[in-house]
């Protein structure tokens, strides 16, 4: 029985989100595509987006060759940390959406931690 990689990733993400919902803290969610990276901070109940950043935004694109490398992910991480702190959020749960903690996901998380987010 073979399982599609994306279906397996979505199953892992669903399980993680259930655990995060029980914690009752804001959630930093990441979406990775082939060309870009998106990050959003949701409220504890998941009903509202508090802050968002992605590689399509002009302030992230400046000085980058493309939006699909670790440098771009680090810029998104710093920007999401700034925006979350401006909204009054300092502690979040990191929802990596079933992706491995490696490469772009790790770069984003490290930059968000350097920016002052705790998770």
UniProtKB/Swiss-Prot annotation:
Gene3D superfamilies to which the protein is assigned, alphabetical: 3.30.420.100
Keyword rRNA-binding: yes
SS bonds (residue pairs): none
Matching Pfam families: Ribosomal_L18p
InterPro entries listed in its UniProt record: Ribosomal_uL18_bac-type (IPR004389), Ribosomal_uL18_bac/euk (IPR005484)
GO biological process, any: translation
UniProt-recorded Gene Ontology molecular function terms: 5S rRNA binding; structural constituent of ribosome
Domain of life: Bacteria
Signal peptide (residue range): none
One GO cellular component term noted in the UniProt record for this chain: cytosolic large ribosomal subunit
Keywords, in A-Z order: Ribonucleoprotein, Ribosomal protein, RNA-binding, rRNA-binding
Function: This is one of the proteins that bind and probably mediate the attachment of the 5S RNA into the large ribosomal subunit, where it forms part of the central protuberance.
HAMAP family: Ribosomal_uL18_B (MF_01337_B)
Family affiliation: Belongs to the universal ribosomal protein uL18 family.
Subunit structure and binding partners: Part of the 50S ribosomal subunit; part of the 5S rRNA/L5/L18/L25 subcomplex. Contacts the 5S and 23S rRNAs.
Name of the molecule in the record: Large ribosomal subunit protein uL18
Annotated source species: Xanthomonas euvesicatoria pv. vesicatoria (strain 85-10) (Xanthomonas campestris pv. vesicatoria)
């Amino acid at each position: 029985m073979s399982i599609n990689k994306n279906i397996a990733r979505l199953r892992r993400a669903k399980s993680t989100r259930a655990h995060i919902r029980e914690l009752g803290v804001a959630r930093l969610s990441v979406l990775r595509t082939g060309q870009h990276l998106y990050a959003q901070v949701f409220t504890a109940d998941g009903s509202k987006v508090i802050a968002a950043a992605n590689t399509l935004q002009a302030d992230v694109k400046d000085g980058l060759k493309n939006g699909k490398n670790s440098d771009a992910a680090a810029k998104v991480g710093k920007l999401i940390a700034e925006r979350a702190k401006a909204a009054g959020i300092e502690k979040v749960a990191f929802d990596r959406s079933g992706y491995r903690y490696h490469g772009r996901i790790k770069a984003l998380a490290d930059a968000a931690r350097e920016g002052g987010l705790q998770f």
